[in-house]
A protein has these predicted regions:
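Residue-level marker of beta-strand positions
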Residues: 195, 206-209, 233, 403
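Bacterial N-terminal signal peptides that target proteins for export
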Residues: 1-10
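Bacterial N-terminal signal peptides
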Residues: 9-21
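Surface-exposed patches in mature extracellular/periplasmic domains of secreted proteins
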Residues: 70-83, 97-106, 126-132, 146-155, ...
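Cleft-lining beta-strand/loop regions that shape enzyme active-site pockets
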Residues: 51-52, 186-189, 197, 202, ...
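Sec-exported extracytoplasmic/periplasmic mature domains
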Residues: 64-73, 87-99, 117-128, 135-148, ...
Length: 452
């Protein structure tokens, strides 16, 4: 789960793998009546209207003022930086389309947000809708905030969802790649019956190239291949780790079946219960607790690939393992931080806890992992979490039906430490490799069993 890049990756690799993108909005209030776009951005309370005007200069104005009014640091932000980011993206879009304008320059700005906007709007004139969309994307990207998003809802495709069926890759962190990713890049999940499955693409297959472009340049992941996933067909050069065989496969998007996220569980040797939680979606905590109603002596909670969700689900699930604990803080720009606490209405399980994490454990998953480690509630096994937890986002409706998602507060861990961009380190390092996936091994679970 939002911006153009998110939709690009989700369309090709499947939206189910993009839950980190959606977690920015997961903590917003439960939708009530539908919002109506007006002259200013308004807090969204339901699905955007289906019939809306195109993106205009006024839409960009709304986004600009919305950031200054509602974003965490908006009230003290230099508005000139926003306009600079917006025009940079606007002109780059024009250049890519061979439509640059000789008269298009950033006017002299004073730092007064109203007079600067008036000068900026005069330069734009009526504006180019595609370039205006790029400008909003660029302005939001300039915040460098993993929970700030601009979303343009698109109607579902006729005939149901389509994609390749590749539902995850090893370096993926929501709409982008982990900047700390190490080679190789490999597939982690393939949907049954999908075009990828029919092409005999399997978990563990190493992506050497995408449309002829290498997945890694030296030891650095090539972020440019993200956009290449949207090609239809897409050409993948794959290496099977069990045999070393390399082949090139061309895949066209086709019908896929999206299963809603669900909690799964099994009993491990020795009596411990393994529970896999794919996201902190509404009701997820109670689903996990229901799987543990037998009050097992030990629990292995698998949060690998968990892209986040609602902070309320985090505190509720933590309440099954401890009471009276501060789990995190939400801090405004000015004023006191507000502590989040375990939901002590939940009955304690009294179980030992091992949590499996990876670099795709993000947002609310970062939050949960930090609370477990910071409060000594259990042991973390796997790899460091994503560190994508700037703060919960709230949605604001713009006049073209798009939604701006902005955090109003900053997240801190239970000791008031910053988790965002850093992540939560594990107690025992046990990464999943391509060969592990291809052969059905699970080093994280194996390590958890030794601890229990």
């Amino acid at each position: 789960m939002l911006a153009a890049m998110i939709r690009t990756l989700c369309a090709a690799v499947l939206a189910a793998a993009c839950s980190i993108s959606m977690s920015a909005a997961a903590s917003a209030p439960t939708p009530q009546p539908v919002s109506t776009p007006g002259t200013d951005c308004a807090a969204i309370t339901g699905p955007p209207p289906q019939s809306v005007p195109p993106t205009s200069v006024n839409t960009l104005r709304q986004a600009y003022l919305c950031v200054l009014e509602h974003y965490y640091s908006g009230p003290v932000m230099d508005s000139r930086a926003l306009l600079k980011s917006a025009l940079a993206a606007y002109t780059q879009d024009l250049i890519r389309r061979g439509a640059d304008r000789a008269d298009l320059r950033l006017p002299a700005l004073t730092g007064n947000r109203d007079t600067d906007w008036a000068a900026f709007a005069k330069v734009l004139g009526t504006g180019d809708p595609a370039a205006l969309r790029a400008a909003i994307t660029g302005m939001v990207a300039g915040l460098h905030d993993n929970h700030a998003r601009w979303v343009r809802p698109t109607p579902p495709p006729q005939g149901g969802p389509v994609g390749t069926g590749i539902a995850g890759v090893s370096a993926q962190q929501g709409p982008q790649f982990d900047p700390a990713a190490r080679p190789p890049l490999f597939i982690t999940k393939v949907l049954a019956g999908s075009p990828a499955a029919k092409a005999d693409i399997r978990p563990g297959d190493i992506m050497v190239k995408v449309n002829g472009v290498p997945a890694f340049i030296g030891d650095s992941v090539n972020h440019n291949i993200i956009d290449l996933f949207a090609a239809d067909p897409v050409r993948l050069t794959l290496k099977r780790p069990t045999t070393g065989r390399t082949r090139t496969v061309e895949i066209r998007q086709g019908p896929i079946t999206r299963q809603p996220p669900k909690v799964t569980s099994k009993t491990l040797p020795g009596g411990a219960v393994y529970v896999q939680l794919p996201g902190f979606y509404e009701g997820a905590a109670d689903q996990v607790i229901a799987k543990l109603q037998g009050r097992p002596e030990a629990v292995v909670l698998d949060l690998r690939g968990n892209g986040g969700g609602s902070p309320r689900e985090v505190t509720r699930l933590l309440g099954a393992f401890a009471h009276g604990k501060v789990t995190s803080y939400f801090c405004p720009l000015k004023g006191e931080c507000v502590p989040n606490r375990t939901d002590d209405s939940v009955r304690l399980l009294g179980s030992r806890l091992v949590v499996l994490t990876d670099r795709a454990c993000a947002s609310a998953c970062d939050d949960f992992s930090a609370a477990v480690k910071g409060n000594g509630l259990g042991t973390l096994v796997g790899t460091r979490t994503a560190g994508a937890v700037s703060g919960p986002g709230e949605g604001y409706l713009l006049d073209d039906g798009s939604v701006l998602i902005l955090p109003k507060v900053r997240h801190l861990g239970p000791a008031r430490e910053i988790i965002d961009t850093i992540g939560v380190p594990v107690d025992h390092y046990a990464p999943m490799t391509a060969l592990d996936l291809a052969t059905g091994r699970d080093p994280g679970l194996a390590k958890a069993l030794t601890l229990l």
